[in-house]
Every structure is written in C-alpha cells, then in structure tokens.
C-alpha cells in the first residue's frame, strides 16, 4: 500500500514507512509504560476514550465546520465531506468548540487524567489552551516537535494526539519519526524554539525523506 505524506509517496511496511507499536498490553503497569515511552518516544493506546463521547464531539466539530463553509452539505453530514476549495481549519485557544462540554468530556476525561496521574506518579494537569485542527484533503502538517508550540511554561509535559473518529490510512493518521526523541542536535537547536517568541511556523521540515536521510529512522503510522 502506498501512502502520500506531503509531496512524497511512501510504501507502507517499506524502507521509509512502518507501523507504530501498540502499548495496550502494558495498561495497568505504569513502570512498563514509562520504560516503553523511554524506548519508543510514544505510546499507542487504543480505546482509551469512550467511543460515544468521541462521536458526540465529532458531531459538534462537524456542525462547526459546516457553519463555516468547510463541509460539503450535499453529502450526509456525518460523513464530513470537505467542501470544494476548503483547506481545513485551526480551532485552538479561545475558540468556543475547544471549550464545549462535549470536547472537554474527551480531552479532559477522568480516564485520561487518571492515566497520566498513574503514568507520572502524581496528580496531572492539562492546559486550558487546546490545539484542535481539521486538515484538508491532500494537505499535511509538516514535521515538528510539539514542544516548540507548547513548551514555554514547562518542558515536563506529554501531548495526546486524539483522532475524533476512525482514521484509516487514507484519511491522514498520525506519523512519528522513529527515534526522533534522541536527535540531540535537533533538540538543542530547533527544539529550543518557541513559535510565539521567535515568530516561526514551528515546522522543522515539510519533506519527510529529508529527515530520514539526514538523521535516520523511518516514519511510523
């Protein structure tokens, strides 16, 4: 299977693109989860969220996008067809949708907060600011570290990528560059940036193969 990533076409399970390793078998064992995080730099956990809560916030998001002309309403609304010419939307910060009860029921769910309290070994907190994006067909988010967007107050943080619905390969799932948590030179330079303070976009590269050729690893999805 070939998948598009930016302007590149990559073969799944090939030289440049593999699959993320699941961590569900480690649930309930914080020590093992911490060791896996240290090893892989991520934790892929399926079914952590209540599916009904995810469906509820998806409906709120689709209604919001439709009201702003981002959805093709000639198709069933729950299928969320992108309107011709629509390029997606960023709805972070003070946008009402990121403070709706349905959205907060997912991203601040008791089960999620408890997971991090167990993982961190103490009470966990979350930012009031949330980063919510809808990315248009054929677009992608360039390679980046999340910390350049959200690490100004503290770097002792973890981010949670939460798809609001099923995301098969053809609908743009997350991709992580294998081993990138150990790219010390990148962490000491680009990783010290702050997008607001330094007035930069936050992307390190929009070419997925450039990073592999320079630093090694492969993309995992």
Regions found by a protein language model. Give the residues of each.
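Non-heme Fe(II)-dependent double-stranded beta-helix
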Residues: 2-40, 46-143, 149-152
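A structural signal for well-ordered alpha-helical scaffolds and beta->alpha junctions
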Residues: 30, 109-113, 157, 167, ...
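Conserved hydrophobic/aromatic beta-strand scaffold that supports enzyme active sites
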Residues: 42-44, 159-163, 217-219
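Short loop segments at secondary-structure junctions
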Residues: 47-49, 164-168, 179-181
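Residues that flank catalytic or metal-binding motifs in active/ligand-binding sites
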Residues: 99, 127-128, 156, 160, ...
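Short, conserved beta-strand element in jelly-roll/cupin
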Residues: 119, 150-169, 205
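Short, structured patches in soluble enzyme cores that scaffold and shape functional sites
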Residues: 131, 145-147, 162-166, 178
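Double-stranded beta-helix
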Residues: 170-221
């Amino acid at each position: 299977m070939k998948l598009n990533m930016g302007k590149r076409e990559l073969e799944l399970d090939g030289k440049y693109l593999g699959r993320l390793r699941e961590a569900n078998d480690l649930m309930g064992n914080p020590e093992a989860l911490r060791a896996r995080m240290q090893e892989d730099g991520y934790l892929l956990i399926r079914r952590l969220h209540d599916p009904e809560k995810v469906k509820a916030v998806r409906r709120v998001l689709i209604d919001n996008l439709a009201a702003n002309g981002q959805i093709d309403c000639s198709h069933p609304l729950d299928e969320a067809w992108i309107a011709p010419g629509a390029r997606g939307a960023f709805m972070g910060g003070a946008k009402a949708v990121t403070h709706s009860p349905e959205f907060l029921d997912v991203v601040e769910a008791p089960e999620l907060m408890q997971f991090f309290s167990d993982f961190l070994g103490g009470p966990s907190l979350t930012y009031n600011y949330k980063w919510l994006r809808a990315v248009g067909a054929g677009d992608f988010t360039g390679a980046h570290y999340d910390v350049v967007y959200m690490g100004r107050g503290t770097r002792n943080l973890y981010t949670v990528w939460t798809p609001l619905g099923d995301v098969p390969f053809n609908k743009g799932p997350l991709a992580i560059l294998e081993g990138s948590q150990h790219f010390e030179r990148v962490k000491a330079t680009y990783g010290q940036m702050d997008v607001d303070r330094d007035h930069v976009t936050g992307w390190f590269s929009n070419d997925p193969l450039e990073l592999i050729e320079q630093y090694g690893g492969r993309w995992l999805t």
